[in-house]
């Protein structure tokens, strides 16, 4: 978008969209970790992995909905020429949180672990798979009783060399 539209227009739209995405995440008990190259990285903490996955899925569906509204109803001022889109990835499991870099805990707060690695690898594939929302196999297993889950494809990942099934969630 930055190549076709003014940086100011894109930045203004992204900041507005980011606020909407953050609100959706927080509405379902999540926390935003960081924003990397247009990606919002969020996490949910707790002991009930199934319940946490459900909250994350609800947030993802809400983000998908507000993004459609944002694009379709003119909040993105170039909506007639270019649809504002986002891709969403859900990956769950145990990770670490804490400060990285800097001395004495003065670094940046972040999350680390297999679920994060999986999410970043899947994020690179979402558009190629023709989907807007991809759910990692282990997360889909946590969601299958609460959502309509459809298998997309099995993909090889660095941390899943034998492959991992991917799914999407129906609206």
What are these regions (language model features)?
Residues 24-55, 69-114, 142:
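Catalytic core of nucleotidyl cyclases, primarily class III adenylyl/guanylyl cyclases
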Residues 10, 17, 36, 52, ...:
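Helical mechanochemical/support elements of P-loop NTPase systems and associated helical scaffolds
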Residues 54-65:
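Amphipathic alpha-helical segments that line or abut small-molecule/effector binding pockets
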Residues 95, 119, 127-171:
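Cytosolic regulatory/linker segments at or just downstream of nucleotide-handling modules
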Residues 3-4, 101-103, 147:
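Short amphipathic alpha-helical segments
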